[in-house]
């Protein structure tokens, strides 16, 4: 039988190649690798294209950012009244559609220096979590903003007849970003107010704020829908926190209902402001907590506690302040007549601990000061017009730093004028400590003696009932060592006054006693209750402590 040769396998057959061995399926279908030189050239080309593209984007972005900055600056200033804004830079990110503004400065046109606000960075972006709820809104984040206002700027703001809601602030903020803002945050901001003394500013540092749901996209109508929280450091050592809800869309102005808490707030920085009410403040630490509501339809404050520690407070009366005192009294009378005060306030408890409270009269020929030191005062259930029921006050301390002082009072709703009961007792006060008062009203000096006074005062239905009874013990108004440099005539007056005190003495106890009747009718039922208290007590006190001294000195002068 004839044998035939097997045909040689071709390279396309799935058999072993005589040169390369068995051939794998699809081996010739793989792309051949480029030479190393060609691969380097392609990589370099891609890098060059990417760099060129980035350069083009950077150039376009830079020009667009400048165009955006100028456009936004113009739009903002077109909406503001009395203020102007400059922007240091602006950038719009194409990836998340966020807008960043840098180095924003706000100036008051009437008083441009210093700027009223500086904003290093403001970021506006889409609020993505609300987008999942099919609400297209935005958020704004202010990083390290600072607000700086001085007295001239504040006075200019108060003079402006344009309402705050019409000055364009909300429109200016909305001009920044095409979407409505629903979340606003402030991070590590600062607020500074400078009154007359730039060395004692009113300042809040480390200020943080968060306001959510501003557009009310989640809550029912008729409620305060926007959670709000703000906190900061007050005057370097104090701390304040406010937390509650707001309605930013209410008209004509936003409403708020919130709780607040103040801790260890130093009060001395308020001295420049308190001086406008004739009050001088030194020291003092404030703690307080409560809640308030302030809106177009309802306004009310409920303060649970106000506690002030180690305060020195003086009420100053001078010829220059007399007009202001009359004006404040008239304003208080108008408020008392108004059945709907601007904001009713109720204070559950007010406490003044270990403090000094005084009255300084610089309008007298011989200025004098009366004070109670180591004062502890507690007032409970204090409300506007005492409409929340009777308020009760209790006071203890040392009169003129020596005698013990006690006082209590009950204040009732004043529908027909001031309505209250008051009792005061001062025992064992040093008479020499009151020489400034004695010189002012009696033109005399006391070198020895103690003073006590007891008083009860009641006002109801415009009828005043009460008395002031002083007891002056071991009084001596003449001393040769003290009188060496005094005019002879003045020495004679003091000898006469000294003789008078001995005539009035109760011999067994070596005391001078008299009683001043306070019965009568209240002339002005619209007077402030505090004005009535101060006037009655001070007038009766002066008459009681100088029983007949004025008369005898005047008689001696005529002789």
What do the predicted segments below correspond to?
Residues 2-49, 251-253, 298-299, 338-348, ...:
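Extended terminal
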Residues 37-109, 233, 239-240, 245, ...:
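N-terminal amphipathic/hydrophobic interface segments
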Residues 41, 162-269, 274, 332-433, ...:
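Elongated, acidic membrane-bridging lipid-handling scaffolds
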Residues 89-155, 169-194, 220-222, 227, ...:
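Flexible beta-edge/linker motif
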Residues 110-111, 274-278, 440-443:
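Extracellular loop and loop/strand-boundary signature of outer-membrane beta-barrel proteins
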Residues 142, 260-262, 306-308, 424-426, ...:
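Transmembrane beta-barrel strands of outer-membrane/channel proteins
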Residues 152-154, 316-320, 478-486:
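Outer-membrane beta-barrel and related beta-rich outer-membrane complex signature
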């Amino acid at each position: 039988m004839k044998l035939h040769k097997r045909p040689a396998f071709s390279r396309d057959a799935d058999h072993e190649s005589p040169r390369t061995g068995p051939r794998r399926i699809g081996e010739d279908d793989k792309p051949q690798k480029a030479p190393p030189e060609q691969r380097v050239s392609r990589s370099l080309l891609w890098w060059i294209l990417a760099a060129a593209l980035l350069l083009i984007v950077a150039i376009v972005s830079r020009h667009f950012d400048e165009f955006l900055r100028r456009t936004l600056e113009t739009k903002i200033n077109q909406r503001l009244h009395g203020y102007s804004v400059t922007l240091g830079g602006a950038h719009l990110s194409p990836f998340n559609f966020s807008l960043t503004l840098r180095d924003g400065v706000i100036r008051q046109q009437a008083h441009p220096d210093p700027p009223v606000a500086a904003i290093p960075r403001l970021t506006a972006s889409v609020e993505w979590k609300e987008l999942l709820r099919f609400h297209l809104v935005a958020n704004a984040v202010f990083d390290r903003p600072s607000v700086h206002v001085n007295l001239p700027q504040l006075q200019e703001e108060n003079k402006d007849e344009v309402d705050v809601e019409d000055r364009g602030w909300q429109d200016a903020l909305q001009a920044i970003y095409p979407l409505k803002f629903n979340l606003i945050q402030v991070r590590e901001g600062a607020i500074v107010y400078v009154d007359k003394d730039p060395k004692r500013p009113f300042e809040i540092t480390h200020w943080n704020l968060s306001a959510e749901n501003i557009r009310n996209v989640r809550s029912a109508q008729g409620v305060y829908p926007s959670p709000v929280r703000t906190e900061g450091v007050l005057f370097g050592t104090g701390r304040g926190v406010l937390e509650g809800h707001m309605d930013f869309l209410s008209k004509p102005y936003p409403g708020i209902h919130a709780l607040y808490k103040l801790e260890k707030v130093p009060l001395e920085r308020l001295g420049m402001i308190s001086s406008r009410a004739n009050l001088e403040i030194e020291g003092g630490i404030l703690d307080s907590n409560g809640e308030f509501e302030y809106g177009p339809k309802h306004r009310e404050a409920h303060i649970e506690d106000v506690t002030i520690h180690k305060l020195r407070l003086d009420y100053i009366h001078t010829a220059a302040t007399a007009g202001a005192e009359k004006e404040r009294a008239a304003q208080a009378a108008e408020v008392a007549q108004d059945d709907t005060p601007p904001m009713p306030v109720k204070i559950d408890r007010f406490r003044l601990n270990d403090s000094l409270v005084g009255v300084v009269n610089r309008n007298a020929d011989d200025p004098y000061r009366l004070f109670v030191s180591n004062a502890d005062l507690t007032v409970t259930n204090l409300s506007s017009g005492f409409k929340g029921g009777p308020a009760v006050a209790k006071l203890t301390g040392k009169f003129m730093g020596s005698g013990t002082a006690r006082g209590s009072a009950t204040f009732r709703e004043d529908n027909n004028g001031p309505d209250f009961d008051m009792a005061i007792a001062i025992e064992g006060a040093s008479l020499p400590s009151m020489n400034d008062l004695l010189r002012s009203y009696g033109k005399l000096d006391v070198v020895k003696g103690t003073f006590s006074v007891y008083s009860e005062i009641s006002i109801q239905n415009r009828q005043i009932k009460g008395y002031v009874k002083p007891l002056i013990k071991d009084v001596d108004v003449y001393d040769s060592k003290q009188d060496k440099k005094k005019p002879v005539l003045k020495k004679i007056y003091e000898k006469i006054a000294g003789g008078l005190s001995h005539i009035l003495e109760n011999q067994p106890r070596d005391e001078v006693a008299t009683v001043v009747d306070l019965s009568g009718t209240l002339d002005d039922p619209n007077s402030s209750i505090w004005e009535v208290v101060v006037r009655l007590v001070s007038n009766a006190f002066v008459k009681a402590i100088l029983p007949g001294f004025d008369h005898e000195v005047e008689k001696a002068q005529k002789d």
